[in-house]
Structures are given as C-alpha cells and as structure tokens.
Design a protein with these regions (language model features):
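Conserved catalytic or regulatory cores that recognize and/or transform ribose-phosphate-containing ligands
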Residues: 1-186
Length: 186
C-alpha cells in the first residue's frame, strides 16, 4: 500500500468534510415506546446528538413530515417507521425485556429489524451498518426466530448486551464512528 502525505489544507478540508458528514448522516434508533422505554431511546438519541450526530432520530422525529391530518394510530406509526428506515444509513436496534404489566415490547422493533434485513437481501437498501443491543436475559426468553436471527447474524451487524440503557451509550457512539468511517471512507 502506498502512502501519501497530506498537506495542511487538505487535512483541514478532510476534517471539515468529516464533521459535515457526521452532522448530516441519518441514524435510526428503533425500540419500544412503552412506559419508560421511550425516555431511554430519547436519552440515547440526545447522547448521540451531543457528540455531533445531529440527525440521530426515533420515528416520532419524522411526525412533521406527514400530512397534518394523519390520525394517530398504527398506520401513522408504520409510516413514521418506514420514513425512519428509508432515510437512514446507520441503524441502532434496542431490544428490551418485558417487565410486569408490559407486553409485546419487541414486536414492533423485531418487525423493523426484519424489514431492514429483507430490504438488504433484495438489494433495495445497500449494505447498511446496524447495531443490535439486547437487554441481558432477553436472549434466554425470546422466541426461536428472534434467537435464530441473532445467532445467524447474516449481515455481520454489531451485537451487544446491556443491563441498563446507559451501558450502550459509548458503544453506540463508537459504532456510529466506525460506520461513518466505513460509509465515507475516512
């Protein structure tokens, strides 16, 4: 491999370009919105934004893009999820265990996870970096298809486990840094 020295102006230009990409790349965060779980996703989004990933988003961040007459409900939720996925280049999935009186927490995020995988399999979305964070213990009680998809990991996505949401902040930021470097060749 040949080595080429960068001139000072070129270094400054590359740094400026890096920050431009970092501030403008769309990062999707998927997970449950039930109870405190939505606050956790918002906290992760805000953490990434504080580190310069200004377009880290959850689906509700796209609400202003829909027709104002769109009624709240499952159709709106699906449209928002589709917008989030279709416009994002980096994807973060957060799978959590159900606590008492919580049900079907991973149903929607599992469908989003499968949708991205299918879009990639059919060449509709190019290779998309994704990180999958799983609350410890979920892997023991989840259904067989979920366990199989995680074990199979056909796209080579990052997989990590956590006890509380704060434990994924730094790994998610590092994942975004690696993904940005891969996408833009930095």
């Amino acid at each position: 491999m040949s080595h080429r020295d960068l001139v000072p102006d070129e270094i400054a230009d590359r740094v400026q370009l890096y920050w431009y990409f970092k501030e403008n790349i769309n990062i999707a965060i998927y997970g449950s919105f039930q109870q405190s779980r939505k606050r956790d996703l918002l906290a992760l989004r805000d953490y990434l934004r504080a580190y310069g990933y200004l377009n880290a988003r959850i689906s509700e961040d796209y609400s202003d893009r829909l027709d104002p007459g769109t009624e709240d409900g499952p159709i709106k939720d699906t449209r928002l999820s589709d917008l989030l996925m279709d416009e994002s280049s980096i994807h973060i999935f957060v799978f959590v265990k159900e606590h008492q009186d919580e049900h079907y927490l991973i149903q929607s995020v599992s469908m989003e996870f499968q949708r991205l995988s299918t879009l990639m399999q059919h060449g509709i979305k190019e290779d998309q970096p994704a990180a999958i964070y799983i609350e410890e213990g979920l892997e023991k009680i989840a259904g067989g298809v979920f366990k199989g998809r995680i074990a199979q990991n056909e796209h080579g996505w990052d997989i990590g486990f956590f006890k509380n949401i704060e434990q994924i902040y730094k790994p998610a930021r590092r994942f975004c840094e690696r993904s940005l470097a891969r996408i833009y060749g930095f």
